[in-house]
Amino acid sequence: MSLLKEFKEFAMRGNVMDLAVAVVMGVAFNKIVTALVDGIIMPCVGLLLGGVNIAGLSFTVGDAQIKWGNFLQNVIDFIIVAFAIFILIKLINLLQRKKANEPEPVTPEVQLLTEIRDLLARNSSKI
């Protein structure tokens, strides 16, 4: 089998395609969370702290500038993304459990046999 054909089979498997879609969606979701943190959450936190720009907070030690405000902003980004993924996984697990607990749908054959059984039972009780 040629290398190109093997790669095509690998790339077209369901898991690889699902992973690719998940990565693209994750990147897009990260941009949304970053915009939320940078544009809404951190300015509100800054207002609560007296109008401070959190991202710009830093201190200097010698020649090194420690930008702890930017670090704090990225930690908040991470917490929001991690919490959203946690909630999503909980929701998926809940839906999978519900689906597993659903009874198998009755096939037309089984339904017909059940009706015949019920009719026979009613007729035998009349005799």
Swiss-Prot record:
Location relative to the cell: Cell inner membrane
Pfam families: MscL
Molecular function terms from GO: mechanosensitive monoatomic ion channel activity
Entries under InterPro entries matching the protein: Mechanosensitive_channel_CS, MS_channel, MSC/AndL, MscL_channel
Main location per the UniProt record: membrane
GO cellular component annotations of the record: plasma membrane
Key words of the record: Cell inner membrane, Cell membrane, Ion channel, Ion transport, Membrane, Transmembrane, Transmembrane helix, Transport
TM ranges: 9-29, 32-52, 75-95
Membrane-related topology note: Multi-pass membrane protein
Family annotation (PROSITE patterns): MSCL
Entry-linked NCBIfam families: mscL, PRK00567.1-4
Subunit annotation: Homopentamer.
Similarity section: Belongs to the MscL family.
Function: Channel that opens in response to stretch forces in the membrane lipid bilayer. May participate in the regulation of osmotic pressure changes within the cell.
UniProt-recorded name of the protein: Large-conductance mechanosensitive channel
GN (gene name): mscL
